[in-house]
Amino acid sequence: MADVKIGFEVHVQLDTRTKLFCDCPTDYEDAEPNENTCPVCTGMPGAKPLPPNEEALLIALEIAHMLDCEPVLDRPLYFQRKHYDYPDLPSGYQRTSVPIAVNGELDGVRIREIHVEEDPGRWEPSTGRVDYNRSGVPLIEIVTEPDMRSPEEARDFLRRLMQVLRYSGKVKGDGGIRVDANVSVEGGARVEIKNINSIKGVYRALRFEIQRQLNLMKHGREVRRETRAFREDQGTTVAMRSKETAEDYRYIPDPDIPVFEITEDLWEKAVARAPEPPHHRARRMAEEYGISLEAAEALVTEREWADFFEEVVEKAPDDWDIEFIDQWVRKEIKKILNKKEMTFREAKITPEEFIELLELVREDKITRQNALNALWEAVDSDKSPVEIIEENGLLKVSDEDRLARVVEEVIEENPQAVEDYKSGKEEAIHYLMGQVMRKTRGQADPEVTMRLLRERLDSDG
């Protein structure tokens, strides 16, 4: 197997109300082109930026904590101008902070450093049009060490990272992910693949690029240190330019942005606001509740799903076993949501309503199927499962006199099934059972019904 080293620079938009250095709104998706702009985010001469958006810094620190990073505390920090010439960068430079947190780790991949920077605008090369609504939206940049050894490892890491970022609740849903992937093979030159905008795209780009470099080496050709672009339609990478160094970007401190510090108070505030990271939460839940790590990992794929599970466990009677709750929360309700293409965030049922339903199941007052039917309707309804059960009369019918009358009707209406049963065909009684269930709309107690059917059929000899 080839000796491969892969590292990432991952960029994701932070969900703030205003941009990083001005008061323009960050909600640009539904805006007209260049509607949410001002002289600062369009790089007008003489325009002076505001001090850095503190909420953006705070969110970045929350995410740094979730990635087990150390804050760069109590020392002067500043924003730099990273110079390059592109139509979507009106000032000719991008403002990016020096590292605000370092030395993190996620699933065995070291996080070298975290920065905050401003997003450039949107340029459409085919038309030449530039929309600066996005210009100045705050980004977090997460830089890893080259610790991944295959496209599969890289893909798994990005999936986990995006899970952590979504868990924070502080990244923009429409901002997506933009990845610069650095890859070297067999100790050769490092090649950067710029601006890949999906995890699937990163995986495909890495597979192609690794094979490209191996093919060059096989034929004795040099792998050049360069920057390449991923062509999604072809699944290939193409050369853009020779690989830049820090000197090429002509980094200088931005004289218009005041120096700032990350104080202990600011860091403690970020830590207090940050949710428990999903990878930590899964380990804790497995240990605390005695469920498998695999089950816990499934629950934490959605923050609201894990929240729901833990709240049900907390509020349910003490004598309920975890296996029962796990079966209904992790499997049954999730199965329904998947079929309806819903997330837990969209589900309308509350933990209290769910517990009421499970109480009926545990007390054997409703059949499992009718409980599932009520749950199916409740997840996207304003009615609770119990309200649906009461409105539709879905509780079990255990009254033997009533059930005996229904059994008698079914036997009279299905003489062929009765004859089949008496000739030894056991499946016939299950057919008759189904007819009783149909007449009672699934409310008949299965055990009582089966006993009454056998007693009635066997009594005829």
UniProtKB/Swiss-Prot annotation:
Membrane-spanning residues: none
InterPro entries on file: Asn/Gln-tRNA_amidoTrfase_suB/E, Asn/Gln-tRNA_Trfase_suB/E_cat, Asn/Gln_amidotransferase, Asn/Gln_tRNA_amidoTrase-B-like, GatB, GatB_C_1, GatB_Yqey_C_2, Gln-tRNA_amidoTrfase_suB_CS
GO biological process: glutaminyl-tRNAGln biosynthesis via transamidation; translation
Cross-referenced SMART domains: GatB_Yqey (SM00845)
Enzyme Commission identifier(s): 6.3.5.-
One Pfam family it belongs to: GatB_N
GO molecular function: asparaginyl-tRNA synthase (glutamine-hydrolyzing) activity; ATP binding; glutaminyl-tRNA synthase (glutamine-hydrolyzing) activity
Catalytic activity: L-glutamyl-tRNA(Gln) + L-glutamine + ATP + H2O = L-glutaminyl-tRNA(Gln) + L-glutamate + ADP + phosphate + H(+); L-aspartyl-tRNA(Asn) + L-glutamine + ATP + H2O = L-asparaginyl-tRNA(Asn) + L-glutamate + ADP + phosphate + 2 H(+)
Keywords: ATP-binding, Ligase, Nucleotide-binding, Protein biosynthesis
Family matches, as PANTHER family: GLUTAMYL-TRNA GLN AMIDOTRANSFERASE SUBUNIT B MITOCHONDRIAL AND PROKARYOTIC PET112-RELATED, GLUTAMYL-TRNA(GLN) AMIDOTRANSFERASE SUBUNIT B, MITOCHONDRIAL
Family: Belongs to the GatB/GatE family. GatB subfamily.
Subunit annotation: Heterotrimer of A, B and C subunits.
Function: Allows the formation of correctly charged Asn-tRNA(Asn) or Gln-tRNA(Gln) through the transamidation of misacylated Asp-tRNA(Asn) or Glu-tRNA(Gln) in organisms which lack either or both of asparaginyl-tRNA or glutaminyl-tRNA synthetases. The reaction takes place in the presence of glutamine and ATP through an activated phospho-Asp-tRNA(Asn) or phospho-Glu-tRNA(Gln).
Protein's name in the database: Aspartyl/glutamyl-tRNA(Asn/Gln) amidotransferase subunit B
